[in-house]
Amino acid sequence: MKFSELWLREWVNPAISSDALSEQITMAGLEVDGVEPVAGAFHGVVVGEVVECAQHPNADKLRVTKVNVGGDRLLDIVCGAPNCRQGLKVAVATVGAVLPGDFKIKAAKLRGEPSEGMLCSFSELGISDDHSGIIELPADAPLGTDIREYLKLDDNTIEISVTPNRADCLGILGVARDVAVLNELALTAPATEPVTATIADRFPIQVDATEACPRYLGRVVKGINVKAATPLWMREKLRRCGIRSIDPVVDVTNYVLLELGQPMHAFDLNRLEGGIVVRMAKEGETLRLLDGTDATLSADTLVIADHQKALAMGGIFGGEHSGVNGETQDVLLECAYFNPLSITGRARRYGLHTDASHRYERGVDPALQHQAMERATRLLLDICGGEAGPVVEAVSEKDLPARATIALRRDKLDRLIGHVISDEKVSDILNRLGCQVTQTADGWQAVAPSWRFDMAIEEDLVEEVARVYGYNNIPNIPTQAPLKMTQHREADLALKRVKTLLVDHGFQEAITYSFVDPKIQSLIHPGEDALILPSPISVEMSAMRLSLWSGLLGAVVHNQNRQQSRLRLFESGLRFVPDQRADLGVRQETMLAGVITGTRYEEHWDLARQAVDFYDLKGDLEAVLALTGKLSVLEFRAESHPALHPGQTAAIYLAGERIGYIGVIHPELERKLDLNGRTVVFEVLWDKLAERVVPEAADISRFPANRRDIAVVVAESVPAGDVLAECKKVGANQLVGVNLFDVYRGKGVAEGYKSLAISLVLQDTARTLAEEEIAATVAQCVAALKQRFQASLRD
């Protein structure tokens, strides 16, 4: 938003420089983007009057004038402007004047005629780009007055960035309020006494869409002269705010917009039929706008209509048919409050962005409409003449926004600001901001002013107090955050340690979204319900993940599509399982997962290209599990999982509790996901592994170890792991190593059976074992296997 510094100082004039004012406005939260002078650097230009104006004898486009500048004689000046005429008050650069660009005025002859100065245009004084003619000053402009003083050109245009929450500052009034508060000054607002109606004409107003338009004011003004000239002072104020003068009616509404921040509109009364109806548009209804374009309206667009047709898009843009033109004599002034939600997004939908929509989208003071109507009426009557009727109002009080009542606690204020501001100062600041303040036992209760709809919660008041008090006035106290060192438990297994191990095994860490495609997730976890997001980023990211596999498999497909065939990825993160017994109905569990695909080794001239298999990933996972020191109670059991190959899947158990799965992706799922080649995955509950068994130091036995090998025949259904576990249990005291080193099926072994070759390593820490003791332990193992598994020694 642009505005004139002098216009602002008409409302509130702190005794500070322009630079200090800009700094103050910025620190108040209205960032100043730029400050520019309203005119170029010049001097020696005064008000003059063209006393005589005659055609130049030697040039068709020049005129010879005699100009009175209040001196003891008339000046002879040659002028080429087409609007130069007798009796016109003009800006005269006298001999010795210096114009922008260091252009010095000297006495000279132009085509044989003497010229003792120059009649100036706006562009020649660096005021605007208008070079169509010389400046036309009001008839009452005093002769000889310095033009800088008369036009108040020692002024600056200040441009600020107004944040969406401070729509009240989209007008001089709002900025002036803030400056007044910061400097503890009173506002000097222009008089807006109610205009007495001199005619009884009323125009009916009916508001059907009361939620979208809780308040609508209309006023008939008849007999205006739309061809009257807009006063120079108003045109200059508009120009300094970046608004071009159009005609007095539009200029008045724009002036009120800039001054008060209240958009207004004027209809040609004689083009309206029946009365004003504020309603929602009919689907497909068309409206020709003021810029000549046609808009096809949607049913959620607010329109101002008469009894026959739509006249304007409410709060956005007027229509061509009912607009004011050069023949207009009677107008209906409109001033309304529109709900921001009824305007937001509508202008962009139609490719529009207007000053009105910019303000209505952010919110306009719902108590401002009467003041704006009276101000606009008075200005219009003063400039264009005419007679005004009474103000007609349609209002729905229940749909107007209520002023927020907010409690501010003393301890909350002190805690958030970090500095104690006296009670009297806080009350004074809130009162100056326009709040109705009541002091309570633990702080204050404030009713926000109607123009501050961004004041809604306690933190808003804290922010306002700090802003007005001045951030620079709050002492700079270094933040203190005492850190209490927690004792490190030796039994804790750090996730970072596991990640390092996996990286050492050739894995790369992946980080995928917690939001996944529900269709893909249902393929991996059929029949399981997931949390569905009410407002997802996209349909493909609308469900919370039930495992890390969805993201990891998606990463595999993504990389395979980019010619990366050999992949080893792992990820740690939360999964989200609906559970009514958990807090907020969702159980969040930290998981560790991995995936491998492609070849077992990087391409090498001496290594065969072998695809990864179940045991490759199982070995990597066992290395991770070994860090827990719980291998003795960890177990892999053949089980099924809907996402995994029925013959190459195992559940992972820790002390009898299932903590995860490992397996090859099911061929059907592999096809549906467009995976290229065998893919092996695992996933375990991290919390079950996060505590390790602390190893205890033990002496290395000084006595020899003895190995004995046995081959036992068991049924095909007997897991080798169970056989090894039974051996460990029987020889617990002296059996220090049990290992399966061969599996045989074939000649000499009956169908449905297998031969397991097992090495038994026996050792004692106190003595050398005798052969009889070794043989007895081996015999106990064989007997135990025979009893539990009906095993027999292979011949």
UniProtKB/Swiss-Prot annotation:
Q: Where is the B5 domain?
A: 401-476
Its cofactor is: Mg(2+)
Q: Name one Pfam family in it.
A: FDX-ACB
Which InterPro entries would you find in this protein's record? aa-tRNA-synth_II/BPL/LPL (IPR045864), B3/B4_tRNA-bd (IPR005146), DNA-bd_dom_put_sf (IPR009061), Fdx_antiC-bd (IPR005121), Fdx_antiC-bd_sf (IPR036690), NA-bd_OB-fold (IPR012340), Phe-tRNA-ligase_IIc_bsu (IPR045060), Phe-tRNA-ligase_IIc_bsu_bact (IPR004532)
EC number assigned by the record: 6.1.1.20
Q: Which CDD domains match?
A: PheRS_beta_core, tRNA_bind_bactPheRS
All copies of domain tRNA-binding, residue ranges: 39-148
Q: Which GO terms describe its biological process?
A: phenylalanyl-tRNA aminoacylation
Give all residue intervals belonging to the FDX-ACB domain. 701-794
SMART domains recorded: B3_4, B5, FDX-ACB
The free-text cofactor remark is: Binds 2 magnesium ions per tetramer.
User: Which keywords describe this protein according to UniProt?
Assistant: Aminoacyl-tRNA synthetase, ATP-binding, Cytoplasm, Ligase, Magnesium, Metal-binding, Nucleotide-binding, Protein biosynthesis, RNA-binding, tRNA-binding
The broad enzyme category this protein falls into is ligase
- The residues that hold Mg(2+) are 454, 460, 463-464
Give the matching SUPFAM superfamilies.
Answer: Anticodon-binding domain of PheRS, Class II aaRS and biotin synthetases, Nucleic acid-binding proteins, PheT/TilS domain, Putative DNA-binding domain
GO MF term set? ATP binding; magnesium ion binding; phenylalanine-tRNA ligase activity; tRNA binding
Q: What is its main location?
A: cytoplasm
Q: Does the keyword Protein biosynthesis apply?
A: yes
- GO CC list: phenylalanine-tRNA ligase complex
Catalytic activity, reaction form: tRNA(Phe) + L-phenylalanine + ATP = L-phenylalanyl-tRNA(Phe) + AMP + diphosphate + H(+)
* Compartment list: Cytoplasm
- Describe, as the record does, how this protein assembles with itself and its partners: Tetramer of two alpha and two beta subunits.
Similarity comment = Belongs to the phenylalanyl-tRNA synthetase beta subunit family. Type 1 subfamily.
Q: Name the HAMAP family for this protein.
A: Phe_tRNA_synth_beta1
What is the name of the protein in this document? Phenylalanine--tRNA ligase beta subunit
Q: Please report the organism this UniProt entry assigns to the protein.
A: Dickeya dadantii (strain 3937)
- Upper taxonomic lineage: Bacteria, Pseudomonadati, Pseudomonadota, Gammaproteobacteria, Enterobacterales
